[in-house]
Amino acid sequence: MERKAVVVGGTGLVGGYVVRELLVQKEYTRVMVMGRRPLDIKHPKLEQALIDWEQPQKSTFALEGVDDVFCCLGTTMKKAGSKERFRQVDLDYPVLTAQLGKEAGAVQMLAVSAMGADPDSRVFYNRTKGEAEEALAAIGLPALHLFRPSLILGARSERRFGEAAATVVMKALDGLMTGRLASYRAIPASFIARAMVRIALAQASGVHIYPNDIIRVIGAELTSDDKEAGTGTTPDDNV
């Protein structure tokens, strides 16, 4: 069955991997990327549409015929500049995406959240992520899949010095993180993307939450199709 995927946040680290994973899947005949700037990628299945979050209704044409919506939006407090702007990117925009997707007839949404997401958390970041999860679930899509990764590894287009330092530490400690600590291991962005696409293809209904260790299991193992398509490991995949 031919499927159309829409990716919001496709210019980011995880989103970029999601786009590449989708393009090599035979089940997806159309891959639409909605963002504020275009991707520098050419592919016969790839379509792109610029979105103005102040006037999102002007971009609803991009969602026509959508089956699966992948939301990979996210920022940092440093980049956002304020708590209000952070909530806008990490909560308001994903919820708006889900609403537009439902109106367009989307069957499922797959969204990147974060480890520790909790609407009752005292930590602003975790609380915002938890509130976003609750709001997404309340929209009532046939299926909602929420992914809660730990520190995400990969080459970003912008420098995040705090994350860079944490990455060095997490890589050094990775071999020591066993037992209960294993669930906190940093995870390559490619693993998250691969897990999201595989879960989408399974087409399970309802609301599902995937913690970091489960994401790693689903996204780590390459299938014969992955190998033939050339979506193999990156340097960070061995973490």
Locate predicted features.
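SDR active-site strand-loop-helix element
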Residues: V8, M34, C72-L73, M109-M115, ...
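N-terminal Rossmann NAD(P)H-binding glycine-rich loop of SDR-like oxidoreductase domains
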Residues: R3-Q25
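NAD(P)H-binding glycine-rich loop region in Rossmannoid oxidoreductase-like domains
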Residues: A5, D40, E47-L96, L100-E103
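Residues at the starts of beta-strands that form the adenosine-phosphate
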Residues: K4, Y28-R30, E47, V107-Q108, ...
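Oxidoreductase cofactor-interface core, primarily capturing Rossmann-like NAD(P)-dependent enzymes
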Residues: V24-E27, P44, P119-T223
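Conserved Rossmann-fold NAD(P)-dependent oxidoreductase catalytic core, especially the SDR/UDP-sugar
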Residues: A80-E84, Q88-E133, A138-F147
